[in-house]
Swiss-Prot record:
Keywords: Cytoplasm, DNA damage, DNA repair, Hydrolase. Its main location: cytoplasm. Coiled coil: none annotated. It is found in: Cytoplasm. It catalyses: Hydrolyzes single-stranded DNA or mismatched double-stranded DNA and polynucleotides, releasing free uracil. Its EC number is 3.2.2.27. It is an enzyme of class 3 (hydrolase). Pfam families: UDG. It comes from Pectobacterium carotovorum subsp. carotovorum (strain PC1). One of its GO terms (molecular function) is uracil DNA N-glycosylase activity. This is Uracil-DNA glycosylase. The active site is at D64 (proton acceptor). The keyword Transmembrane helix does not apply.
Length: 228
Protein backbone atom coordinates (compact mmCIF):
# COMPACT_ATOMS: atom_id res chain seq x y z
CA UNK A 1 0.00 0.00 0.00
CA UNK A 2 1.40 3.37 -1.03
CA UNK A 3 0.87 6.45 1.11
CA UNK A 4 1.76 10.09 0.55
CA UNK A 5 4.75 10.12 2.88
CA UNK A 6 7.39 12.68 1.88
CA UNK A 7 11.13 12.63 2.43
CA UNK A 8 10.52 15.27 5.08
CA UNK A 9 8.45 12.72 7.02
CA UNK A 10 11.12 10.01 6.64
CA UNK A 11 13.95 12.37 7.59
CA UNK A 12 12.02 13.75 10.56
CA UNK A 13 11.71 10.25 12.01
CA UNK A 14 15.41 9.52 11.53
CA UNK A 15 16.61 12.89 12.82
CA UNK A 16 15.35 11.93 16.28
CA UNK A 17 17.37 8.70 16.37
CA UNK A 18 20.60 8.73 18.42
CA UNK A 19 22.67 7.24 15.57
CA UNK A 20 21.62 10.07 13.23
CA UNK A 21 22.25 12.78 15.81
CA UNK A 22 25.72 11.30 16.45
CA UNK A 23 26.52 11.14 12.73
CA UNK A 24 25.61 14.78 12.12
CA UNK A 25 27.46 15.81 15.28
CA UNK A 26 30.64 14.04 14.12
CA UNK A 27 30.50 15.65 10.68
CA UNK A 28 29.81 19.07 12.21
CA UNK A 29 32.79 18.75 14.56
CA UNK A 30 35.06 17.73 11.69
CA UNK A 31 34.02 20.81 9.71
CA UNK A 32 34.44 23.01 12.80
CA UNK A 33 37.96 21.60 13.31
CA UNK A 34 38.90 22.95 9.89
CA UNK A 35 38.77 19.70 7.94
CA UNK A 36 37.43 19.86 4.40
CA UNK A 37 34.36 17.67 4.17
CA UNK A 38 32.55 16.95 0.91
CA UNK A 39 29.97 17.77 -0.18
CA UNK A 40 29.41 21.22 1.36
CA UNK A 41 26.87 21.16 4.17
CA UNK A 42 24.08 22.68 2.07
CA UNK A 43 24.39 19.86 -0.49
CA UNK A 44 24.52 16.78 1.77
CA UNK A 45 20.83 15.93 1.31
CA UNK A 46 20.46 17.07 -2.32
CA UNK A 47 19.34 13.61 -3.48
CA UNK A 48 16.11 14.15 -1.51
CA UNK A 49 15.77 17.81 -2.53
CA UNK A 50 15.65 17.08 -6.26
CA UNK A 51 13.69 13.78 -6.24
CA UNK A 52 10.69 13.66 -3.90
CA UNK A 53 9.62 10.25 -2.57
CA UNK A 54 6.45 10.02 -4.69
CA UNK A 55 8.39 11.07 -7.84
CA UNK A 56 11.08 8.36 -7.67
CA UNK A 57 11.09 6.01 -10.68
CA UNK A 58 14.70 4.75 -10.75
CA UNK A 59 17.27 4.42 -7.93
CA UNK A 60 21.02 4.45 -8.63
CA UNK A 61 23.06 3.61 -5.53
CA UNK A 62 26.58 4.95 -5.17
CA UNK A 63 29.03 4.33 -2.34
CA UNK A 64 30.43 7.55 -0.87
CA UNK A 65 30.90 11.05 -2.34
CA UNK A 66 33.78 12.03 -4.59
CA UNK A 67 36.61 13.30 -2.39
CA UNK A 68 38.26 15.79 -4.77
CA UNK A 69 37.65 19.56 -4.85
CA UNK A 70 34.47 20.86 -6.50
CA UNK A 71 33.21 17.38 -7.41
CA UNK A 72 30.60 16.13 -4.93
CA UNK A 73 27.29 17.95 -4.65
CA UNK A 74 25.04 15.34 -3.05
CA UNK A 75 24.00 13.28 -6.10
CA UNK A 76 25.73 9.93 -6.63
CA UNK A 77 28.13 9.79 -9.62
CA UNK A 78 27.36 13.43 -10.51
CA UNK A 79 29.88 16.30 -10.45
CA UNK A 80 29.39 20.04 -10.56
CA UNK A 81 29.23 21.83 -13.92
CA UNK A 82 32.68 22.61 -15.27
CA UNK A 83 34.30 19.58 -13.60
CA UNK A 84 35.40 16.72 -15.90
CA UNK A 85 33.53 13.42 -15.57
CA UNK A 86 35.46 11.11 -13.20
CA UNK A 87 36.36 7.62 -14.49
CA UNK A 88 33.22 5.81 -13.26
CA UNK A 89 30.96 8.43 -14.80
CA UNK A 90 32.97 8.32 -18.03
CA UNK A 91 32.17 4.59 -18.18
CA UNK A 92 28.50 5.28 -17.47
CA UNK A 93 28.51 7.64 -20.46
CA UNK A 94 30.30 5.02 -22.56
CA UNK A 95 27.58 2.49 -21.75
CA UNK A 96 24.83 5.03 -22.47
CA UNK A 97 26.40 5.79 -25.86
CA UNK A 98 26.22 2.09 -26.81
CA UNK A 99 22.80 1.48 -25.19
CA UNK A 100 20.67 4.51 -26.04
CA UNK A 101 20.29 5.42 -29.74
CA UNK A 102 21.44 8.98 -30.43
CA UNK A 103 23.09 9.47 -27.02
CA UNK A 104 26.02 11.86 -27.33
CA UNK A 105 28.57 11.94 -24.53
CA UNK A 106 28.28 15.36 -22.86
CA UNK A 107 31.23 17.52 -21.91
CA UNK A 108 30.05 17.75 -18.32
CA UNK A 109 29.14 15.36 -15.50
CA UNK A 110 26.19 17.21 -13.95
CA UNK A 111 23.31 14.74 -13.50
CA UNK A 112 20.72 16.97 -11.85
CA UNK A 113 18.43 16.64 -14.88
CA UNK A 114 18.23 12.89 -14.14
CA UNK A 115 17.26 13.62 -10.52
CA UNK A 116 14.55 16.04 -11.64
CA UNK A 117 12.99 13.28 -13.78
CA UNK A 118 12.75 10.81 -10.89
CA UNK A 119 16.19 9.17 -10.75
CA UNK A 120 17.21 9.05 -7.07
CA UNK A 121 21.01 9.39 -7.11
CA UNK A 122 21.76 8.10 -3.62
CA UNK A 123 25.15 7.49 -2.06
CA UNK A 124 25.02 5.03 0.84
CA UNK A 125 27.42 7.28 2.80
CA UNK A 126 26.64 10.99 2.46
CA UNK A 127 29.91 12.68 3.48
CA UNK A 128 33.67 12.15 3.09
CA UNK A 129 36.88 13.88 4.17
CA UNK A 130 38.85 15.48 1.35
CA UNK A 131 41.25 13.01 -0.24
CA UNK A 132 40.20 10.15 2.07
CA UNK A 133 37.89 7.70 0.33
CA UNK A 134 35.50 5.87 2.69
CA UNK A 135 36.67 8.02 5.64
CA UNK A 136 33.07 8.46 6.84
CA UNK A 137 32.05 4.82 6.40
CA UNK A 138 30.55 3.09 9.46
CA UNK A 139 29.59 6.34 11.19
CA UNK A 140 25.86 5.78 10.82
CA UNK A 141 25.12 6.94 7.28
CA UNK A 142 24.64 3.32 6.18
CA UNK A 143 21.86 2.89 8.74
CA UNK A 144 20.20 6.03 7.43
CA UNK A 145 20.35 4.95 3.80
CA UNK A 146 19.02 1.49 4.75
CA UNK A 147 15.99 3.29 6.21
CA UNK A 148 15.65 5.32 3.01
CA UNK A 149 15.73 2.15 0.89
CA UNK A 150 13.22 0.51 3.25
CA UNK A 151 10.89 3.51 2.85
CA UNK A 152 11.14 3.24 -0.95
CA UNK A 153 10.49 -0.50 -0.74
CA UNK A 154 7.41 -0.08 1.45
CA UNK A 155 5.90 3.15 0.14
CA UNK A 156 6.35 2.64 -3.60
CA UNK A 157 5.84 -0.07 -6.22
CA UNK A 158 7.49 -0.79 -9.56
CA UNK A 159 10.72 1.10 -8.92
CA UNK A 160 13.80 0.18 -10.95
CA UNK A 161 16.92 -0.25 -8.79
CA UNK A 162 20.26 -0.15 -10.63
CA UNK A 163 22.74 -1.93 -8.35
CA UNK A 164 26.31 -1.72 -9.60
CA UNK A 165 28.96 -3.60 -7.66
CA UNK A 166 28.84 -5.74 -4.53
CA UNK A 167 28.38 -2.80 -2.13
CA UNK A 168 25.16 -1.66 -3.84
CA UNK A 169 23.97 -5.24 -4.30
CA UNK A 170 24.26 -5.95 -0.56
CA UNK A 171 22.06 -2.92 0.04
CA UNK A 172 19.59 -4.44 -2.39
CA UNK A 173 18.92 -7.37 -0.06
CA UNK A 174 16.18 -5.36 1.65
CA UNK A 175 14.25 -4.72 -1.60
CA UNK A 176 11.20 -6.90 -2.27
CA UNK A 177 11.73 -8.19 -5.80
CA UNK A 178 8.03 -9.03 -6.14
CA UNK A 179 7.21 -5.31 -5.89
CA UNK A 180 10.25 -3.77 -7.59
CA UNK A 181 12.70 -4.40 -10.42
CA UNK A 182 16.40 -4.95 -9.69
CA UNK A 183 19.09 -4.75 -12.37
CA UNK A 184 22.58 -5.82 -11.27
CA UNK A 185 26.01 -5.49 -12.83
CA UNK A 186 29.64 -4.92 -11.82
CA UNK A 187 30.58 -1.36 -10.82
CA UNK A 188 31.38 1.16 -13.60
CA UNK A 189 34.80 1.82 -12.04
CA UNK A 190 37.70 1.21 -14.46
CA UNK A 191 38.68 -1.72 -12.21
CA UNK A 192 35.49 -3.64 -12.96
CA UNK A 193 33.50 -2.03 -15.80
CA UNK A 194 34.85 -4.47 -18.39
CA UNK A 195 33.54 -7.41 -16.34
CA UNK A 196 29.96 -6.72 -17.34
CA UNK A 197 28.98 -3.13 -16.64
CA UNK A 198 29.86 -2.18 -20.21
CA UNK A 199 27.18 -3.92 -22.24
CA UNK A 200 24.66 -4.26 -19.37
CA UNK A 201 22.04 -2.10 -21.17
CA UNK A 202 20.54 -1.05 -17.84
CA UNK A 203 19.42 2.34 -19.12
CA UNK A 204 17.27 1.02 -21.97
CA UNK A 205 15.99 -1.80 -19.74
CA UNK A 206 14.99 0.72 -17.05
CA UNK A 207 13.04 2.74 -19.62
CA UNK A 208 11.29 -0.40 -20.92
CA UNK A 209 10.26 -1.30 -17.36
CA UNK A 210 8.90 2.22 -16.81
CA UNK A 211 7.01 2.23 -20.11
CA UNK A 212 5.45 -1.16 -19.27
CA UNK A 213 3.92 0.59 -16.24
CA UNK A 214 2.62 3.48 -18.36
CA UNK A 215 5.32 5.84 -17.07
CA UNK A 216 7.37 8.20 -19.18
CA UNK A 217 10.94 7.02 -19.86
CA UNK A 218 14.01 8.85 -18.55
CA UNK A 219 15.82 11.20 -20.93
CA UNK A 220 19.31 9.95 -20.11
CA UNK A 221 21.08 12.88 -21.79
CA UNK A 222 22.32 14.99 -18.84
CA UNK A 223 21.36 18.62 -19.40
CA UNK A 224 22.84 21.71 -17.83
CA UNK A 225 20.19 24.14 -16.49
CA UNK A 226 20.55 26.50 -19.47
CA UNK A 227 19.96 23.58 -21.87
CA UNK A 228 16.80 22.36 -20.19
Amino acid sequence: MATSLTWHDVLAQEKQQPYFINTLEFVGKERAAGKTIYPPQKDVFNAFRFTELHQVKVVILGQDPYHGPNQAHGLSFSVRPGVPAPPSLANIYKELASDIPGFEIPRHGFLQSWAEQGVLLLNTVLTVEAGQAHSHANLGWETFTDRVIAALNEQREGLVFLLWGSHAQKKGNIIDQRRHHILKSPHPSPLSAHRGFLGCKHFSQANQLLEQQGLSPIDWTPRLPEEA
